[in-house]
Curated annotation (Swiss-Prot):
Top-level division of the source organism's lineage: Bacteria
Name of the featured protein: Glutamate--tRNA ligase 2
Record carries keyword Cytoplasm: yes
Catalytic activity: tRNA(Glu) + L-glutamate + ATP = L-glutamyl-tRNA(Glu) + AMP + diphosphate
Molecular function in Gene Ontology: ATP binding; glutamate-tRNA ligase activity; tRNA binding
GO biological process: glutamyl-tRNA aminoacylation
Protein keywords: Aminoacyl-tRNA synthetase, ATP-binding, Cytoplasm, Ligase, Nucleotide-binding, Protein biosynthesis
Family as reported in the entry's similarity comment: Belongs to the class-I aminoacyl-tRNA synthetase family. Glutamate--tRNA ligase type 1 subfamily.
Function field: Catalyzes the attachment of glutamate to tRNA(Glu) in a two-step reaction: glutamate is first activated by ATP to form Glu-AMP and then transferred to the acceptor end of tRNA(Glu).
Gene: gltX2
Alphabetical list of HAMAP family matching this protein: Glu_tRNA_synth_type1
Motif, 'KMSKS' region: chain positions: 239-243
E.C. number(s) listed in UniProt: 6.1.1.17
Binding site for ATP: 242
Length: 447
């Protein structure tokens, strides 16, 4: 069975870049009736916070993503210790004692010599006696993984054939001096323990994947299938910063972006398919890693906003009823949804049809038109034909047409230059409110 995982670090709020990876994993699991696990990579105890862990879970649920299993890495220290012991016994983990200053000096020296700043494995040459002496002097070792002297290759699910030359990479530190295991190591151990079959993540993990493939094999396992999505860029082709608060899911939700719109946008971003407002189930039916380009994708806020508008236009009343102003009806929603950039704007139009507006100040000529229009209002009950019946009568009486006719009426009735069709709004407003607004506006002083 397909088993994927989404593994954020709870050191901040979920950003669109990570959210895209979560969406890809969730859709892949749905597409193949597989399992989706939420793993919190929280071994960095200093930076990880419970509030971020909870926020990540909330944001995923907001997008409609559910998981079959979830766990925190901090709860699996025994698992990592056992794996580390096995690697130490096989000679693949070795202790190191160099300070950051010593390592920096070595890197600078190699660069001056025209050599790649790869760790020189000097600690492999230490004798047991030298190690014992270092520890006796108060030094605590950190541990590196001894990489194989080879090139690791795989067929990437998005990028195609990929290779990583392990000889060109420093042996990674996998356990700090304080005993804390690091991501490169813990991720592999957890993927083995939980039976992950596919790893879908960003292309910034390409080198990690080479190293981790070697780690899988050192632990006697075959690495899962790998797929790396190209990183997101901003609309201008620059790097998309994870530090921009406006691109966290929390901020996007506050700004009125609908979860369906965001998921639909992220699901197809960088692929050959245009985004459409679809449910997770609908997106999963056609989800295919082969559809993604190997080139970087651009996250364009204006495109997301446009998709948000389209999403609102397709949402039924039942999906938004609880978030509309109290008393709002299905007829109201049908009338206004085509004019909304975000759902919160429905409040403005509810005030128009059921509340009050500030009377606009019009010219004397426009006020005269309103006075002509007032007695021509049809008798109730009103329906969607009332507007055309009324304006036809006003046109004949005033000899006005087009913008000269419709603009003063719209301003007087709604206080806005543009908006939903007045044929739909007029029956919702009712005759009494319409008469009151025409009277108040036409009696206002012209500017």
């Amino acid at each position: 069975m397909v088993h994927v995982r989404f593994a954020p670090s709870p050191t901040g709020y979920l950003h669109v870049g990570n959210a895209r990876i979560a969406v890809a994993n969730a859709l892949f699991a749905l597409r193949y009736s597989g399992k989706f696990t939420l793993r919190l990579d929280d071994t960095d105890l200093e930076r990880s916070r419970d509030e971020y862990a909870e926020a990540i879970a909330q944001d995923l649920r907001w997008m409609g993503i559910e998981w079959a299993d979830t766990f925190r890495q901090r709860d699996n220290m025994d698992r990592y210790e056992a794996a580390a012991d096995a690697l130490k016994a096989s000679g693949r983990l070795y202790p190191c004692f160099e300070s950051e200053e010593e390592l920096r000096y070595k890197r600078e020296l190699r660069l001056k010599q025209g050599r790649a700043p790869v760790y020189d494995r000097a600690m492999l040459k230490m004798t047991p006696e030298q190690r014992a002496q270092a520890e006796a002097n108060g030094k605590r070792p950190y541990w590196r993984f001894l990489l194989s002297d080879r090139t690791v290759g795989w067929r990437d699910g998005v990028l195609g054939p990929r290779q990583v030359k392990l000889q060109a990479i420093s042996d990674p530190v996998v356990i700090r001096a304080d005993g804390t295991p690091l991501y490169t190591f813990t991720s592999v151990v957890d993927d083995i323990a939980t039976g992950v079959t596919h790893i879908i993540r960003g292309e910034d993990h390409i080198s990690n994947s080479g190293v981790q493939t070697d780690l899988f094999e050192a632990l006697g396992k075959v690495a899962p299938a790998l797929a790396h999505l190209p990183l997101l860029m901003d609309a201008d082709g620059g790097k998309l910063s994870k530090r921009i608060d406006s691109l966290t899911l929390r901020s996007l939700a506050r700004d009125g972006i609908e979860p369906v719109a965001l998921v639909s946008y992220l699901a197809r971003l960088g692929s050959s398919r245009d985004p459409q407002p679809l449910t997770l189930a609908e997106l999963a039916q056609e989800f295919d890693l082969d559809a993604f380009s190997a080139s970087s994708a651009r996250f364009d806020g204006s495109q997301l906003a446009a998709l948000n508008r389209r999403t609102l236009q397709t949402m039924p009343f039942s999906a938004v009823q609880d978030r509309l102003p109290q008393g709002a009806t299905e007829a109201f929603w049908e009338a206004v949804r085509g004019n909304l950039d975000m759902l919160a704007e429905a409040r403005l139009w509810w005030d128009v049809v059921a509340g009050s507006i500030v009377p606009p100040v019009l010219t004397d000529e426009d006020n005269a038109l309103l006075k002509q229009a007032l007695p021509l209002l049809p008798q109730e009950p009103w329906d969607t034909t009332t507007w055309s019946v009324w304006t036809r009568a006003v046109k004949e009486a005033s000899d006005r047409s087009g913008r000269a006719l419709f603009r003063p009426l719209r301003l007087a009735l709604t206080g806005e230059e543009h908006g939903p069709e007045l044929a739909a709004l007029l029956p919702l407003m009712g005759a009494e409110r319409v008469r009151t607004r025409l009277t108040l506006t036409s009696g206002a002083m012209a500017g």
